[in-house]
Swiss-Prot record:
Protein name in UniProt: Hemoglobin subunit beta
Transmembrane stretches, start-end: none
Binding locations of heme b: 63, 92
Organism: Electrophorus electricus (Electric eel)
Keyword Transport on entry: yes
């Protein structure tokens, strides 16, 4: 997946309108609520037994910020996303044994969270297309060690 210069600009612009402290926790909470089987990777987070518990869980919020921090690295390295995520891919594959399809689910959850935050005027079809291509590259990079 190759981002055009216009799409790269759209990603950088989009990124400037997001707050990691807000969007990360929302996206991870959405993942855990919408796809409850993903909760098995977060047993150490304590109570994640309901939507309210997930939304109020400080460990979910903290890890959501970590996820957005990792995405920030990709935004800053748009020319080398695979290289940027090489070590993280190895950790998720060999140590954490995360099903790589969960990266796609998190990308979907992140996209919905961004769309809700920015609304139709801030998240138009062109921006969505750029974000989809960017996140597809991220998902591919995170799954690289599984192949």
């Amino acid at each position: 997946v190759e981002l055009t210069e216009a799409q790269r600009g759209a990603i950088v612009n989009l990124w400037g309108h997001l707050s990691p402290d807000e969007i990360g926790p929302q996206a991870l909470a959405r993942l855990l609520i919408v796809y409850p089987w993903t909760q098995r990777y977060f047993a150490s987070f304590g109570n994640i037994s309901s939507a309210a518990a997930i939304m109020g869980n400080p460990k979910v919020a903290a890890h959501g910020k970590v996820v957005v921090g990792a995405l920030d690295k990709a935004v800053k390295n748009l020319n080398n996303i695979k290289g940027t995520y090489a070590a993280l891919s190895t950790i998720h594959s060999e140590k954490l044994h995360v099903d790589p399809d969960n990266f796609r689910l998190l990308a979907e959850s992140f996209t919905v969270s961004v769309a809700m935050k920015l609304g139709p005027s801030g998240f138009n079809a062109e921006t969505q297309h750029a974000l989809a291509k960017f996140l597809a590259e991220v998902v591919s990079a995170l799954g690289k060690q599984y192949h």
